[in-house]
């Protein structure tokens, strides 16, 4: 492989920026642009050490940057190659100059995710661990971070490998049965082992799939839509949950004319919070577009926060909103409790049909804790302890596990129907291959390229 280089930190002003190199010539290329005290070279130092010096533009020896350089020699590195990390002052110009000098001396600009891809190709991590790197970067809550860390440490990989080993052992018994069909006792034993092993694998796959709903919540967040008539406090609710003024709050109905999104962490529950334009009939063409978008977002929501005005009587529009969210996960919020109550709370609870109803005065910042508790209890009836289970949160993994479950079910069905043993072998092999796709043991190169292209440059 050639030697790659990229800026590994976000571009912009900051305390430190890092240029990373990885490959067989990483140390030699770095030496060409590094000037150490008393003529020290990076090739002469011990691995896993850091050194002060300057990056210079040779042959003029013009000093470009004052740096600290980490030297990490193969194979004890993330990529299992020689790795150099040049720690520069944060900024745009100088760090770019350092990168350009490295490229001029023979490094190639890395593709997105190429450092992690090399870690995978060199056997440092498997595919599920590589995907967990991106999950860790994108984690919005402590729980999501813990789930990603568990996957990075190989918890899912170990489970998948054990299941594949069980299937492989079962296939070995099938092979014996095919090779020695004349022995009835072998056939009987094979049948018993097949049922036991296949049933056990199926149960473990089902256990993993049961974690997928909460796993996806942790990974992607709940699509949470705030709805209600104009001027009931939807934007105030968004701002209270986000703790920032993201939406315009006025007394004028229809102020929010579009969909406003924000990612928030509510007691460990990641929410993709969406504030919609008030749903009502309107002649204003701009507001009408916002209302249509609100209706579309509503259809795709995981959770609805339906806001009503505590100081007004329940309107026909309010009732229609309840009808629009029938059968969905809804929390009803009676806002403006600081004003004289006029709403029929018994009628509201009747329309809520057992779903949570909380009261708030967003103006006085009252009732937010009750709302957060309702959100948490609705989705985590028992608090998730990410250390207790292996969670599946990746859509690709979920799809593969569903296919593997069907394959093992087909194998069990074939055994029950006494189909030829070599037909059962096909289904078992299919399940074994599918599970291999999760960890990258049996996956097409184009899929690998696609997965790593989603990473940021320098990772």
From Swiss-Prot:
Residues noted as binding (6S)-5-formyl-5,6,7,8-tetrahydrofolate in the record, renumbered to the chain: 20, 85, 124, 459
Chain sites annotated for binding Mg(2+): 235, 256
Function noted in UniProt: Exhibits a very high intrinsic GTPase hydrolysis rate. Involved in the addition of a carboxymethylaminomethyl (cmnm) group at the wobble position (U34) of certain tRNAs, forming tRNA-cmnm(5)s(2)U34.
Cofactor: K(+)
Binding-site residues for K(+), renumbered to this chain: 231, 250, 252, 255
Consequence of gene disruption: No visible phenotype.
Predominant place of localization: cytoplasm
Domain (TrmE-type G) ranges: 221-380
Assembly and interaction partners: Homodimer. Heterotetramer of two MnmE and two MnmG subunits.
GO MF entries: GTP binding; GTPase activity; metal ion binding
Subcellular location: Cytoplasm
UniProt xrefs under NCBIfam families: mnmE_trmE_thdF, PRK05291.1-3, small_GTP
Keywords: Cytoplasm, GTP-binding, Hydrolase, Magnesium, Metal-binding, Nucleotide-binding, Potassium, tRNA processing
Residues where GTP binds: 231-236, 250-256, 275-278
Cross-referenced HAMAP family: GTPase_MnmE
Co-factor binding comment: Binds 1 potassium ion per subunit.
Species assigned in the record: Bacillus subtilis (strain 168)
The protein's enzyme class: hydrolase
Gene Ontology BP terms: tRNA methylation; tRNA wobble uridine modification
Name under which the protein is recorded: tRNA modification GTPase MnmE
Gene3D superfamilies to which the protein is assigned, alphabetical: P-loop containing nucleotide triphosphate hydrolases, Probable tRNA modification gtpase trme, domain 1, tRNA modification GTPase MnmE domain 2
Recorded GO CC terms: cytoplasm; cytosol
PANTHER family, per the entry: TRNA MODIFICATION GTPASE GTPBP3, TRNA MODIFICATION GTPASE GTPBP3, MITOCHONDRIAL
UniProt EC number: 3.6.-.-
The family this protein is said to belong to: Belongs to the TRAFAC class TrmE-Era-EngA-EngB-Septin-like GTPase superfamily. TrmE GTPase family.
